């Protein structure tokens, strides 16, 4: 897992820099204008998603590393991908960006809490050298700091950055591919065995969570565009961040595998979900 451990933080920092380049202060202040829509998405992603993931892990009686890996991907925020697919689905892109931005920044606290708490529940021992504070500080260096730097750069050269945002999104997409290609290459002898163990769990989590988030949003938020956005935000996670956290805490590739499986499945289910919504509308 040596290659993945080395490239994951670099790629994640660059991806978060790209996210920051696409953000402005209005993406944070916007939530004050539509607090209900934001809160429903925020609560669904930050609270309900990890609870559903824990339920899936316990019901399927997953091996401990796979179960904790599932919790890591469930704790991860949405990424640029969720913003892109929300646009493709004619969802509320502004709300999607706000959710991604806020949940990403909060993730330096929420992710360590979810992972360490769930590991304790699932009977997984974490090294005494690993603390919630230590994880949060390391995450801040590769998540929060790059986002802030990106926002500062955008503020200094907004017109130029705005004209290049599509290129920036494509670059971040390739960085995502590089990380997961490294996982497959480095663990090519074992990857299919791991995927066989994790595949059903991540498929169930992804489908159940998108459907549940959509139903919750349908009950509480203002319109169909917001409902699509919240469902996709809860179904499309920042896989690179999840890989970074998994390699930061654990030495076993098994903890990373649910992330790799989820990254494959979420695109397929995401597009199927969008297709169904378009047909129904």
Predicted regions and their residues:
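Alpha-helical transmembrane segments of multi-pass small-molecule/ion transporters
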Residues: 1-281
């Amino acid at each position: 897992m040596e290659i993945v451990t080395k490239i994951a933080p670099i790629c994640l920092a660059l991806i978060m820099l790209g996210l920051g380049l696409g953000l402005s202060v209005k993406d944070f202040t916007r939530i004050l204008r539509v607090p209900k829509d934001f809160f429903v998405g925020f609560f669904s992603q930050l609270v309900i998603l990890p609870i559903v993931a824990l339920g899936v892990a316990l019901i399927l009686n997953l091996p401990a590393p796979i179960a904790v890996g599932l919790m890591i991907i469930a704790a991860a925020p949405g990424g640029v991908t969720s913003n892109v697919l929300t646009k493709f689905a004619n969802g509320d892109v502004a709300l999607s960006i706000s959710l991604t931005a806020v949940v990403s920044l909060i993730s330096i606290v929420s992710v360590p809490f979810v992972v360490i708490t769930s590991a304790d529940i699932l009977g997984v021992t974490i090294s005494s050298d690993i603390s919630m504070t230590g994880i949060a500080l390391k995450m801040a260096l590769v998540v929060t700091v790059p986002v802030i730097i990106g926002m500062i750069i955008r503020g200094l050269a907004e017109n130029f950055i705005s004209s290049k945002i599509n290129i920036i999104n494509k670059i971040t997409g390739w960085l995502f591919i590089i990380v997961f290609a490294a996982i497959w290459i480095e663990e090519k002898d074992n990857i299919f065995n791991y995927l066989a163990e994790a595949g059903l769990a991540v498929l169930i989590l992804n489908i159940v969570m998108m459907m549940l988030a959509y139903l919750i949003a349908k009950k509480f938020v203002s319109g169909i565009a917001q409902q699509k956005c919240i469902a996709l935000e809860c179904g499309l996670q920042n896989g690179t961040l999840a890989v970074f956290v998994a390699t930061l805490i654990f030495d076993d590739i098994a903890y990373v595998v649910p992330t790799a499986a989820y990254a494959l499945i979420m695109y397929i289910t995401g597009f199927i979900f969008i297709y169904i919504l378009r047909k129904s509308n």
